[in-house]
Protein backbone atom coordinates (compact mmCIF):
# COMPACT_ATOMS: atom_id res chain seq x y z
CA UNK A 1 0.00 0.00 0.00
CA UNK A 2 1.29 3.48 -0.84
CA UNK A 3 -0.87 6.31 0.42
CA UNK A 4 1.95 8.66 1.33
CA UNK A 5 2.35 9.93 -2.22
CA UNK A 6 -0.08 11.12 -4.82
CA UNK A 7 -1.15 9.37 -7.03
CA UNK A 8 -1.83 6.51 -4.65
CA UNK A 9 -1.91 2.77 -5.10
CA UNK A 10 -4.89 0.59 -4.07
CA UNK A 11 -4.40 -1.76 -1.13
CA UNK A 12 -4.49 -5.51 -1.63
CA UNK A 13 -5.36 -8.33 0.79
CA UNK A 14 -4.04 -11.35 -1.11
CA UNK A 15 -0.80 -11.50 0.86
CA UNK A 16 -2.68 -11.27 4.16
CA UNK A 17 -5.02 -14.10 3.22
CA UNK A 18 -2.11 -16.25 2.03
CA UNK A 19 -0.23 -15.75 5.30
CA UNK A 20 -3.27 -16.60 7.43
CA UNK A 21 -3.91 -19.85 5.56
CA UNK A 22 -0.38 -21.04 4.77
CA UNK A 23 -0.48 -23.82 7.40
CA UNK A 24 -3.73 -24.68 9.17
CA UNK A 25 -1.81 -26.74 11.74
CA UNK A 26 0.24 -23.80 12.99
CA UNK A 27 -0.84 -20.60 14.77
CA UNK A 28 0.26 -17.33 13.23
CA UNK A 29 1.33 -13.88 14.38
CA UNK A 30 0.66 -11.27 11.72
CA UNK A 31 1.53 -7.58 12.01
CA UNK A 32 -0.25 -5.36 9.48
CA UNK A 33 1.17 -1.83 9.38
CA UNK A 34 -1.45 0.33 7.69
CA UNK A 35 -0.17 3.53 6.09
CA UNK A 36 -3.36 5.52 6.64
CA UNK A 37 -3.90 8.09 7.95
CA UNK A 38 -0.76 9.82 6.68
CA UNK A 39 -0.12 13.04 4.82
CA UNK A 40 -0.92 14.13 2.18
CA UNK A 41 -4.33 12.73 3.27
CA UNK A 42 -5.61 11.87 -0.18
CA UNK A 43 -7.56 8.68 0.58
CA UNK A 44 -11.26 8.55 1.40
CA UNK A 45 -14.12 10.93 0.61
CA UNK A 46 -13.41 14.34 2.14
CA UNK A 47 -16.80 15.63 0.96
CA UNK A 48 -18.35 13.74 3.88
CA UNK A 49 -16.57 16.14 6.23
CA UNK A 50 -17.54 19.71 5.20
CA UNK A 51 -15.02 22.13 6.74
CA UNK A 52 -17.67 24.40 8.25
CA UNK A 53 -19.35 21.49 10.07
CA UNK A 54 -16.21 19.95 11.54
CA UNK A 55 -15.61 20.15 15.28
CA UNK A 56 -11.90 20.76 15.74
CA UNK A 57 -10.00 19.48 18.78
CA UNK A 58 -9.31 22.33 21.24
CA UNK A 59 -5.55 22.19 20.63
CA UNK A 60 -5.83 23.06 16.92
CA UNK A 61 -6.03 26.67 15.71
CA UNK A 62 -9.38 27.29 14.03
CA UNK A 63 -8.55 28.52 10.52
CA UNK A 64 -10.26 27.66 7.20
CA UNK A 65 -7.16 25.81 5.98
CA UNK A 66 -6.95 23.79 9.19
CA UNK A 67 -10.60 22.80 8.81
CA UNK A 68 -10.03 21.73 5.21
CA UNK A 69 -6.99 19.62 6.08
CA UNK A 70 -8.63 18.15 9.18
CA UNK A 71 -11.57 17.05 7.05
CA UNK A 72 -9.18 15.22 4.72
CA UNK A 73 -7.54 13.65 7.76
CA UNK A 74 -10.91 12.39 9.03
CA UNK A 75 -11.74 11.05 5.57
CA UNK A 76 -8.54 9.02 5.58
CA UNK A 77 -9.34 7.65 9.04
CA UNK A 78 -12.69 6.51 7.64
CA UNK A 79 -10.87 4.88 4.73
CA UNK A 80 -8.56 3.12 7.19
CA UNK A 81 -11.57 1.91 9.17
CA UNK A 82 -12.79 0.25 5.99
CA UNK A 83 -9.41 -1.44 5.58
CA UNK A 84 -9.64 -2.82 9.12
CA UNK A 85 -13.10 -4.14 8.33
CA UNK A 86 -11.80 -5.93 5.23
CA UNK A 87 -8.97 -7.50 7.23
CA UNK A 88 -11.37 -8.75 9.91
CA UNK A 89 -13.64 -10.14 7.20
CA UNK A 90 -10.66 -11.96 5.70
CA UNK A 91 -9.89 -13.42 9.14
CA UNK A 92 -13.52 -14.51 9.43
CA UNK A 93 -13.29 -16.30 6.08
CA UNK A 94 -10.33 -18.34 7.31
CA UNK A 95 -12.41 -19.70 10.20
CA UNK A 96 -10.05 -18.30 12.83
CA UNK A 97 -11.94 -15.19 13.93
CA UNK A 98 -13.02 -16.77 17.23
CA UNK A 99 -9.60 -18.12 18.24
CA UNK A 100 -7.48 -15.10 17.25
CA UNK A 101 -6.48 -12.20 19.48
CA UNK A 102 -6.73 -8.98 17.45
CA UNK A 103 -4.99 -5.82 18.68
CA UNK A 104 -5.46 -2.47 16.96
CA UNK A 105 -3.29 0.50 17.82
CA UNK A 106 -1.77 3.64 16.31
CA UNK A 107 1.77 4.90 15.98
CA UNK A 108 1.36 8.41 17.38
CA UNK A 109 -0.87 11.49 17.25
CA UNK A 110 -1.95 13.24 14.07
CA UNK A 111 0.44 15.31 11.95
CA UNK A 112 -0.76 18.65 13.26
CA UNK A 113 1.26 21.06 15.42
CA UNK A 114 1.40 19.96 19.03
CA UNK A 115 0.59 16.34 18.22
CA UNK A 116 3.00 14.05 16.36
CA UNK A 117 6.68 14.69 17.16
CA UNK A 118 5.87 15.79 20.71
CA UNK A 119 5.66 14.10 24.11
CA UNK A 120 2.39 15.80 24.93
CA UNK A 121 -0.74 13.74 25.45
CA UNK A 122 -1.87 14.59 21.91
CA UNK A 123 1.36 13.12 20.59
CA UNK A 124 1.81 9.86 22.49
CA UNK A 125 -1.61 8.84 23.87
CA UNK A 126 -3.00 6.54 21.19
CA UNK A 127 -5.78 4.01 20.76
CA UNK A 128 -5.50 0.35 21.78
CA UNK A 129 -8.46 -1.89 20.96
CA UNK A 130 -8.55 -5.64 21.60
CA UNK A 131 -10.87 -8.39 20.34
CA UNK A 132 -10.70 -12.02 21.44
CA UNK A 133 -13.95 -13.95 21.34
CA UNK A 134 -14.89 -15.49 24.68
CA UNK A 135 -11.90 -13.97 26.47
CA UNK A 136 -11.95 -10.17 26.09
CA UNK A 137 -15.24 -8.60 27.19
CA UNK A 138 -16.75 -6.64 24.31
CA UNK A 139 -17.32 -2.93 24.98
CA UNK A 140 -15.24 -2.82 28.16
CA UNK A 141 -12.93 0.15 28.73
CA UNK A 142 -9.91 0.40 31.00
CA UNK A 143 -7.55 3.14 32.16
CA UNK A 144 -4.65 0.71 32.57
CA UNK A 145 -1.35 2.17 31.32
CA UNK A 146 0.51 0.18 28.65
CA UNK A 147 3.37 0.86 26.23
CA UNK A 148 4.24 -0.63 22.85
CA UNK A 149 7.02 -2.62 24.52
CA UNK A 150 4.30 -4.52 26.40
CA UNK A 151 2.68 -5.93 23.26
CA UNK A 152 5.20 -8.70 22.52
CA UNK A 153 5.21 -10.16 26.06
CA UNK A 154 1.41 -10.07 25.96
CA UNK A 155 1.28 -12.02 22.70
CA UNK A 156 3.78 -14.56 24.06
CA UNK A 157 1.60 -15.12 27.14
CA UNK A 158 -1.58 -15.32 25.06
CA UNK A 159 -0.03 -18.07 22.92
CA UNK A 160 0.25 -20.35 25.98
CA UNK A 161 -2.89 -22.44 25.46
CA UNK A 162 -2.44 -24.34 28.74
CA UNK A 163 -2.05 -21.37 31.09
CA UNK A 164 -2.22 -17.99 29.31
CA UNK A 165 -1.59 -16.01 32.51
CA UNK A 166 1.66 -17.83 33.23
CA UNK A 167 4.68 -15.61 32.69
CA UNK A 168 6.50 -17.39 29.88
CA UNK A 169 10.14 -18.26 30.37
CA UNK A 170 12.06 -16.56 27.57
CA UNK A 171 15.73 -16.80 26.68
CA UNK A 172 15.86 -13.01 26.80
CA UNK A 173 14.32 -10.35 29.02
CA UNK A 174 11.87 -8.14 27.11
CA UNK A 175 11.72 -4.41 27.81
CA UNK A 176 7.98 -4.62 28.45
CA UNK A 177 5.63 -6.80 30.46
CA UNK A 178 2.44 -8.66 29.61
CA UNK A 179 -0.87 -6.86 30.08
CA UNK A 180 -2.85 -10.03 29.38
CA UNK A 181 -4.42 -9.95 32.89
CA UNK A 182 -5.99 -6.61 31.94
CA UNK A 183 -7.35 -8.01 28.68
CA UNK A 184 -8.84 -11.02 30.45
CA UNK A 185 -10.46 -8.88 33.14
CA UNK A 186 -8.21 -10.20 35.92
CA UNK A 187 -6.71 -6.78 36.67
CA UNK A 188 -7.65 -3.12 36.21
CA UNK A 189 -4.07 -1.83 36.33
CA UNK A 190 -0.77 -2.60 34.65
CA UNK A 191 1.96 0.05 34.85
CA UNK A 192 2.39 2.83 37.39
CA UNK A 193 4.06 5.04 34.80
CA UNK A 194 4.56 5.27 31.04
CA UNK A 195 7.48 7.03 29.39
CA UNK A 196 8.07 9.04 26.23
CA UNK A 197 11.11 10.29 24.34
CA UNK A 198 11.60 12.59 21.34
CA UNK A 199 14.88 14.00 20.05
CA UNK A 200 13.57 15.82 16.93
CA UNK A 201 16.19 14.17 14.73
CA UNK A 202 16.09 13.97 11.74
CA UNK A 203 12.89 16.05 11.73
CA UNK A 204 14.79 19.23 12.60
CA UNK A 205 17.47 20.68 14.90
CA UNK A 206 18.10 18.71 18.11
CA UNK A 207 15.37 19.39 20.67
CA UNK A 208 15.41 16.43 23.07
CA UNK A 209 12.39 15.96 25.33
CA UNK A 210 11.66 13.30 27.94
CA UNK A 211 8.27 12.56 29.46
CA UNK A 212 6.64 10.44 32.15
CA UNK A 213 2.95 10.07 33.02
CA UNK A 214 0.89 8.30 35.67
CA UNK A 215 -2.24 8.54 33.53
CA UNK A 216 -3.46 11.72 35.22
CA UNK A 217 -0.42 13.99 35.16
CA UNK A 218 2.37 14.27 32.60
CA UNK A 219 5.84 15.63 33.38
CA UNK A 220 7.99 16.83 30.48
CA UNK A 221 11.63 17.88 30.59
CA UNK A 222 13.26 19.78 27.73
CA UNK A 223 16.96 18.91 27.82
CA UNK A 224 17.89 21.90 25.62
CA UNK A 225 15.29 24.50 26.62
CA UNK A 226 17.20 27.42 25.10
CA UNK A 227 17.04 25.93 21.60
CA UNK A 228 14.27 26.68 19.10
CA UNK A 229 11.86 23.87 18.29
CA UNK A 230 11.52 23.53 14.52
CA UNK A 231 9.84 20.51 12.95
CA UNK A 232 10.59 20.48 9.24
CA UNK A 233 7.44 18.62 8.18
CA UNK A 234 5.28 21.32 9.77
CA UNK A 235 7.37 24.48 9.68
CA UNK A 236 10.02 23.65 7.08
CA UNK A 237 10.22 24.75 3.46
CA UNK A 238 10.40 22.70 0.31
CA UNK A 239 11.23 23.80 -3.25
CA UNK A 240 10.73 27.51 -4.05
CA UNK A 241 10.28 28.35 -0.36
CA UNK A 242 6.86 26.68 -0.14
CA UNK A 243 5.79 25.49 3.31
CA UNK A 244 5.53 21.74 3.70
CA UNK A 245 2.14 22.23 5.35
CA UNK A 246 0.23 25.39 4.40
CA UNK A 247 -2.00 25.34 7.49
CA UNK A 248 0.99 26.26 9.70
CA UNK A 249 1.28 29.70 8.07
CA UNK A 250 -2.42 30.32 8.76
CA UNK A 251 -1.79 29.59 12.43
CA UNK A 252 0.96 32.21 12.52
CA UNK A 253 -0.97 34.77 10.50
CA UNK A 254 -4.54 34.38 11.75
CA UNK A 255 -4.24 33.45 15.41
Say what each PLM segment does.
Residues 176-181, 190-198:
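Polar, glycine-rich mid-to-C-terminal structural blocks
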Residues 205-206:
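Extended ligand-binding clefts on enzyme/binding-domain cores
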